[in-house]
Amino acid sequence: MKHIRNFSIIAHIDHGKSTLSDRLIQTCGGLSSREMQAQVLDSMDLERERGITIKAQSVTLNYQAQDGNTYQLNFIDTPGHVDFSYEVSRSLAACEGALLVVDAGQGVEAQTLANCYTAMEMELEVVPVLNKIDLPAAEPERVAEEIEDIVGIDAIDAVRCSAKTGLGVDLVLEEIVARIPAPVGDPDAPLQALIIDSWFDSYLGVVSLVRIKNGSLKKNDKIKVMSTGQVWGVDRIGIFTPKQVDTQGLGCGEVGWVVCGIKDIHGAPVGDTLTQAKNGAEKALAGFKKVKPQVYAGLFPISSDDYESFRDALDKLSLNDASLFFEPESSTALGFGFRCGFLGMLHMEIIQERLEREYDLDLITTAPTVVYEIELNDGSTIHIDSPSAMPPVNNIKEMREPIAECNILLPQEYMGNVITLCIEKRGVQTNMVYHGNQVALTYEIPMAEVVLDFFDRLKSTSRGYASLDYGFKRFETSEMVRLDIMINGERVDALAIITHKENAQYRGRQVVEKMRELIPRQMFDIAIQASIGNQIIARSTVKALRKDVTAKCYGGDVSRKKKLLNKQKEGKKRMKSLGRVDVPQEAFLAILHVGKD
């Protein structure tokens, strides 16, 4: 056991985690040079296309150290995006140490900090690594000082390497062996294995990634899932050397995968403990804290026949992605679908793309909302996550919206722009600290403003240099209203949005204008209105197409023309009272992007 090292790699987006893991795999000979490709661990097409890591991946490598011993390194590559921080905390729970990778050109960024603090709270050994030192813009000395100044860990002797060229990677491996402690555990105690991740394989059933804390696990053992009490036999067991390799068993302190023939998707929840069926462990390991979704949106299949397969797809996806929440919902405009909860807008986009690709579905999304707390006149408190669930205005005593605490790290020269942006988003500054050339700003901004497009706007005002980390702080009383969109006097429930009273007029006008462009012209006028309660705050009209009925008259009496025009008028009137307007697909999507341009 003393030759095992478990660690994860944490870093900000694009600081080179996945490339460094490629080099580690190559140096330790995990894959032959023929099988090697860039970002081996980003196994989803989506990850490769966007160049981001979404799922944490684990690998077991054997490394011959300079002291002559062979060490077993189990490492987990983690995502850097703020929406996927729960993946990071899960990975860290299975480790004794973490490599903190910092780009020697960019320096410390907000996500580096957030993930690093998570690691320190879990009492892991944090080993700083300065990456990308082959770049002309690299300033390892300045960045090392920055790490000491902002993060507060000793970084004078931080390893300098370039994951791209492979320079200094052997030093990184030596540091891992020297500084990260070996796992602690009792090989003879009853089995306790923590499920770090699970996914569904259509041939094998549920495959779980586990970290053995105490005891050991062998093929054909009978094991019990502690939360459900169900007993399963271990069919296959093994490790990833990125490829799935079968072994006879896993010892104490090791990380590997287990297949028990579980067909039920909720049979092995993430964060659960496995133990032996006979003489098992008394109590389960401390799992992970459940993450609460921050953004809710309705997802509806375009054709109602897809509803069943859509539900299966969500079931399978939620096994792999523990933070996805969903419940059935129906809408008069869109039929049956699900209300889904996500951690942020990126998470929502990724889930939607995964559903469309991996499960071949066509979906419509409604405008995302956050969770509001409402105190009613009778003194009870409710939480709502969709505009249609909002009670009538006269029953509401007060409405509270969620406030997020945002930590923003940025170079000084962009400070003006970023502060202006935060004020525009109704933010309140609570702290500001200078670290050399960097400024750390802390703002309290309403969650609804943060999740919508704050991240994109922040990146564009600071030319990509500012970085953001946010978390839910509290609920605060605020004047929120429900903005309804009416088409020819009928409310379209899927287009309703909850917004702040100050922005309501502006949002209403924007949505109405956007709708006017997108709804095709009919033979009669279509009135598009935005209303709050019974008060109309914006209106625009899609003008009717009309046929020139008098074209066939030439000269002659004017009463003939009048007769034809009046006949047309009658027809239009009847059409208007009977006509129905179909809202096209683009109109629902346009709501998501209102106010971006």
From Swiss-Prot:
Coiled-coil annotation reads none
Pfam families xrefs: EFG_C, GTP_EFTU, GTP_EFTU_D2, LepA_C
Name of this protein: Elongation factor 4
Q: Where is the tr-type G domain?
A: 2-184
Chain sites annotated for binding GTP: D14, H15, G16, K17, S18, T19, N131, K132, I133, D134
Q: Name one GO molecular function term.
A: translation elongation factor activity
Q: What is its biological role?
A: Required for accurate and efficient protein synthesis under certain stress conditions. May act as a fidelity factor of the translation reaction, by catalyzing a one-codon backward translocation of tRNAs on improperly translocated ribosomes. Back-translocation proceeds from a post-translocation (POST) complex to a pre-translocation (PRE) complex, thus giving elongation factor G a second chance to translocate the tRNAs correctly. Binds to ribosomes in a GTP-dependent manner.
- Key word GTP-binding present: yes
- Per UniProt, which keywords does this protein have? Cell inner membrane, Cell membrane, GTP-binding, Hydrolase, Membrane, Nucleotide-binding, Protein biosynthesis
